[in-house]
């Protein structure tokens, strides 16, 4: 009940983006019934993005939690049965939208794992696909390097705009971004400054031109090449924004290790740290 208009709109945008993601067949939306983010508003937002199957469950109207759960499960099972009848089709890489992320970083992230992701990104772009570079707070100190790669003056200016907005927001509450970034874990792993961390972070974007800057969770068009999404440095929130924007898969580098995933999109974990690869084998997919 505490959401105001911009927060509420963002919530609806993300839910609509999740429903529209290519990995999703259909959506069951569950609500309490008296929140600000009303069911009819959410349904409208979803229907503006996609015509996929959509069902609604309102707990207060269903007769309580247990009845609402039964109803939602029944709807979900119906959709699973329908989805199982679909036939897989091959699509070109140009239809692929890949999100890139880093978390639990250490020096091996910038030296090995992120450059590997950058090479992948360049290959996706060369094949006509789309790669999303995220985490605006981790461009700070390296934003001028990204801006030099902007495809247009508008993109150049937007890169500086999103970075400066984060810095200004922190100053408004008397904080400095460098007081919380790098994190204690980053420092324990060997990263010394925010600029060092940012230089490693932007390696995930390879060497391709930056063609666009998207707001958080907004629909990313296919065949866009390298683009930026204005996301926070918080890993689950950043990944959620890219998936809401249409990313079908996320490639995630980590030096110290992290289990962060996503319910809709596969999250492939890459590390450049052999100790982390050996220690967290159930969380890490690739040793870079």
Can you say where each PLM-predicted feature lies in the sequence?
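Metallocofactor- and cofactor-centric catalytic cores in central/energy metabolism, strongly enriched
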Residues: 1-288
């Amino acid at each position: 009940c505490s959401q105001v208009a911009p927060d509420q709109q963002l919530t609806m945008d993300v839910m609509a983006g999740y429903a529209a993601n290519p990995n999703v067949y259909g959506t069951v939306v569950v609500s309490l019934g008296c929140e600000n983010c009303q069911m009819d508003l959410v349904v409208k937002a979803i229907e503006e993005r996609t015509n996929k199957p959509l069902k609604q469950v309102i707990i207060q109207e269903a007769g309580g939690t247990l009845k609402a759960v039964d109803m939602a499960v029944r709807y979900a099972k119906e959709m699973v049965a329908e989805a199982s009848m679909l036939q897989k089709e091959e699509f070109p890489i140009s239809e692929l939208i890949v999100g890139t992320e880093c978390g639990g970083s250490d020096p091996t992230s910038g030296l090995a794992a992120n450059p590997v992701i950058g090479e992948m990104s360049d290959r996706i772009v060369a094949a006509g696909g789309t790669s999303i570079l995220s985490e605006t707070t981790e461009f700070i100190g390296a934003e001028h390097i990204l801006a030099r790669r902007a495809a247009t003056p508008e993109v150049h200016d937007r890169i500086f705009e999103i970075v400066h907005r984060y810095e200004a927001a922190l100053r408004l509450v008397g904080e400095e971004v460098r007081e919380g970034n790098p994190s204690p874990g980053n420092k324990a792993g060997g990263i010394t400054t925010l600029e060092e961390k940012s230089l490693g972070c932007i390696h995930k974007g390879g060497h391709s031109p930056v063609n666009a800057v998207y707001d958080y969770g907004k629909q990313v068009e296919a065949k866009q090449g390298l683009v930026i999404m204005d996301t926070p440095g918080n890993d689950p929130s950043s990944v959620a924004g890219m998936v809401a924007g249409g990313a079908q898969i996320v490639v995630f580098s980590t030096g110290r290790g992290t289990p962060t995933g996503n319910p809709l999109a596969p999250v492939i974990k890459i590390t450049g740290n052999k100790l982390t690869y050996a220690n967290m084998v159930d969380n890490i997919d690739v040793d870079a």
